[in-house]
Amino acid sequence: MPLDKKFKDVLSLNFGKDDEIHVGLLASSGQFNNGTITLDEIDEFIAEYKDDYNVFMCYAPIDGEDRLLENAKPTRFLVADIDGAEIPKEFPPSYYWETSPNKYQGLWISDKVIAPKDYEVLAHAMVKKFKFDSASDIVHLYRIPTTINHKYATPQEVSEPKGDGTVYRRQDIFC
């Protein structure tokens, strides 16, 4: 299933037509492959790989071939693994998707870009405040909605993104 147009429009806040999006594929054998695609290629990428691989992407732009912290560019998104925690009612994600039963990932949209060093501070504060999974660096790979989670004996569909698309004022991201 392709990503819905609205969510692709959200992704375009961070990625221009020709910008590279860093992606990853995890095979059941444990072999991991990194690569890049453009936003125009995302539906084809999902269709080609979701049935056989865990499919991930980095939601922050990267300058260069390597997905390293020093190559991260400013982003409009904060992204987090909400595994084992409640979706916060006082600071709900702009969009979230279920990656397996009762486990979610969320994306918060900022009205202004967030510098990589500020992202790290905000992400760690969110982890602490809301008890999110600690894997929260700006270049972390997260599941792509509408793919399949092959981590379990019975594969789980990753849901379509849900949420109202709230755009948070940068100064109100309080974490």
What do the predicted segments below correspond to?
Residues 1-77, 85, 140, 167, ...:
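DNA replication initiation on ssDNA origins
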Residues 96-105, 142:
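Short, conserved phosphate-binding/catalytic loop or strand-edge motifs used
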